[in-house]
Amino acid sequence: MSCRLLLYVSLCLVETALMNTKITQSPRYLILGRANKSLECEQHLGHNAMYWYKQSAEKPPELMFLYNLKQLIRNETVPSRFIPECPDSSKLLLHISAVDPEDSAVYFCASSHGENTEVFFGKGTTLTVV
């Protein structure tokens, strides 16, 4: 019985690892002064919905933007310096103008089949503004 459980857990971990490779973000780490920058995300899962989350130090992730079937749903608390772009259903960009030290955080891209389904996350982009 324990061998079956170990095999099952191993297969679940492999599946999770494979899912993570199907959502890519670039760059992975970014350190810069006040400038304009774009973050990129691409998913190869055939999902209809894509998201950007911001996780500041010692805070839970905050949903910034959601594109569902290429329709934008915006978190109104996000500053207008953050502009998402969804050129197609598999790619999501996040343009940041005049980055500020308060923008230092980890930015996660995610995707799902729709708003109320399982969400798969990329590995994140760590942005440090100096």
UniProtKB/Swiss-Prot annotation:
Region of interest called V segment, as start-end residue ranges on this chain: 22-112
UniProt signal peptide: 1-21
Sorted UniProt keywords: Adaptive immunity, Glycoprotein, Immunity, Immunoglobulin domain, Receptor, Signal, T cell receptor
Annotated GO CC locations: plasma membrane; T cell receptor complex
One record GO biological process: adaptive immune response
Glycosylation site positions: 36, 75
Region span, J segment: 116-130
Chain intervals for the UniProt region annotation (D segment): 113-115
One Pfam family of this chain: V-set
Protein name listed in UniProt: T-cell receptor beta chain V region A20.2.25
Taxonomic source organism: Mus musculus
Lineage of origin: Eukaryota, Metazoa, Chordata, Craniata, Vertebrata
